[in-house]
UniProtKB/Swiss-Prot annotation:
Assembly description: Monomer. Component of the ribosomal small subunit (SSU) processome.
Compositional bias annotation for Basic and acidic residues: 283-302, 315-326
Keywords attached to this entry: Coiled coil, Developmental protein, Nucleus, Ribonucleoprotein, Ribosome biogenesis, RNA-binding, rRNA processing
Protein's recorded name: KRR1 small subunit processome component homolog
Gene (name only): dbe
Location of the protein in the cell: Nucleus, Nucleolus
Length: 344
């Protein structure tokens, strides 16, 4: 064993500042000289429109997997892809990586990108977004937000997360480092929950700049990140007249007076039928008199002469108006008269 290999196998007990920056120890053939005991296989189906592309690139897929001692089969009749281990396979996890590769290829990811998942530091994530939004129109609109105009939003997500992202149908396929996959998943899920992706992109850009400053390594970054308030207003129609809530009282409201209670209070309850009838007639005649009075006033209103101003008040107004003198106009007249006198 060389010195470099001995250093890699050495287990460090020191605290780790950044777990994402840790190097994953490589798994070599010497670590598993006997290979795998049982044959493992994974199969996945692909849609009809991918048949032509997969048929063209399948020799490259077989060549790529044979380097890791894996077998690949393409069944065009059933529309399936199968990967299997062989007797020479020594990496037990490479079959899982190969399964992810054929899954990505079935989701319209090109072979040049899908084969990267076989690397140790590269992973993949297939995010299902079809059941996150109930209405089809909203789903299409929010999925389009994720892509952006001319794919600009998707490109910016790829640059910030170092991941390859593909939006296809009801899924979003992501391929890249594991930290970037977490960020892509957060952005996609929040976008489908009606949070515009530009907000998360801005936050990622700020975080990238803050990571460059070692003084802020142990500080809270929430004060630097933008805070966005939800401005969704309720679409419920508000009533024109809103009822004011009455003050809370622990006692129940008093019982309303009945007709008998009112008659007892006024003394009408103890009158006989003739007296009640006489009282009703009296009330009726009083109402008729008031109505006749109002009608006479309305008729006589046309015959009431208008009020005339007295002669003394009109003279006072004339005197008041005559006492007012326009000083500016008088000055202008005097200056004009002086000019005429000088010229003559």
């Amino acid at each position: 064993m060389s010195e470099s290999e001995a250093e890699e196998t050495k287990i460090s007990t020191e605290p780790v500042d950044n777990a994402w920056a840790m190097k994953i120890p490589t798994f070599r053939q010497e670590d598993n000289p006997h290979g795998v005991v049982e044959e493992s296989s994974f199969a996945t189906l692909f849609p009809k429109y991918r048949e032509r592309y997969l048929k063209e690139v399948w020799p490259l897929v077989e060549q790529c997997l044979s380097e890791h001692h894996l077998k690949a089969e393409l069944d065009l009749m059933e529309g399936s892809m199968v990967v299997k281990t062989s007797r020479k396979t020594w990496d037990p996890y490479i079959i899982i990586k190969a399964r992810d590769m054929i899954k990505l290829m079935a989701r319209s990811v090109p072979f040049e990108q899908a084969k990267r998942v076989l690397q140790d530091d590269i992973g993949c994530d297939i995010i299902k977004i079809g059941n996150l939004v109930h209405k089809k129109e909203k789903f299409v609109k929010r999925r389009q937000r994720l892509i952006g105009p001319n794919g600009a939003t998707l490109k910016s997500i790829e640059l910030l997360t170092d991941c390859y992202v593909l939006v296809q149908g009801n899924t979003v396929s992501a391929l890249g480092p594991y930290k970037g996959l977490q960020q892509v998943r957060d952005i996609v899920l929040e976008t489908m929950n009606n949070v515009h992706p530009i907000y998360n992109i801005k936050a990622l850009m700020i975080k990238r700049e803050l990571m460059k400053d070692p003084r802020l390594a142990n500080e809270d970054w929430s004060r630097f990140l933008p805070k966005f308030k939800n401005k969704n207003i309720s679409k419920r129609k508000q009533p024109k007249v809103k009822k004011q809530k009455k003050e809370y009282t622990p006692f129940p409201p008093s019982q309303p007076e009945s007709k008998v209670d009112k008659q007892l209070a006024s003394g009408e309850y103890f009158l006989n039928q003739e007296q009640k009838q006489a009282k009703r007639n009296q009330g009726r005649t009083e109402k008729q008199k008031e109505a006749a009075k109002r009608q006479d006033e309305r008729r006589n209103k046309d015959f009431v002469p208008p009020t005339e101003e007295s002669a003394a008040s009109s003279r006072k107004k004339e005197d008041g108006s005559s006492t007012k003198v326009d000083v500016k106009a008088l000055k202008a007249k005097l200056i004009k008269a002086n000019k005429k006198a000088k010229s003559s």
